[in-house]
């Protein structure tokens, strides 16, 4: 495991002023899209952020985009030893870990009849098992602090379903169930556990769609537009800061009204 910054260590330093001043946050999958927006928003609100990417180039991009001592780290969330090493390093260098945002995820889409076992397992390993593993790893420092915020990024697909994504839908629904159970376990220790469930967000994936496809999507959305990554980031920051202190075990939809529970 390497960390992209001036050295191969997680940088130390003092977070800036803001609602999250003095806190340390770990954001997985932070090199682009929703993850990059979340990392930027938490840093803007004063947190020292460690954002992860699967490549050195991605980690360096995170470090260059974030202010102050916030930095990027190379991490494969499926690698249990690497996850443990990174969490240990953050706590060792900064003395605490306040916020975990489980954002990293993959898709391996196909119709169920054509889906290979490997495509199912890769998505479950990355989008569900890794979320559990990282959440478990941060519980010890959070319990010691008697304070912590875990925010899991799920998807509207976890509740509405989507053809060609049985693996992705199962993983995201699983994260929502895990979130509720974990929230009941750790609430007495001052730790909240919540989900943010984006709908269709303007990212690299949706930008590859045709104008006709985008028009078809927006017709399903009462607010009449695709969401922005910053919309999701604002929801995460709310749950991570003081405003979300009495909220736990919920899934906050950020979908423009396309799916209403």
Named regions from a protein language model:
Residues 24, 31-32:
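Conserved glycine-rich cofactor-binding loop
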Residues 45-61:
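Conserved glycine-rich Rossmann-like NAD(P)H-binding loop of the short-chain dehydrogenase/reductase
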Residues 111-112, 116-124, 150, 217:
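Substrate-binding pocket helix/loop in short-chain dehydrogenase/reductase
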Residues 135, 171, 179:
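Active-site helix of classical SDR
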Residues 140, 184-188, 245:
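Alpha-helical segment proximal to the catalytic Tyr-Lys
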Residues 155:
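Residue(s) in the substrate-gating loop at a strand-loop-helix junction
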Residues 187, 192, 247-249, 255:
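Short, small/polar-rich loop/turn modules that mediate ligand/substrate recognition or access, typified
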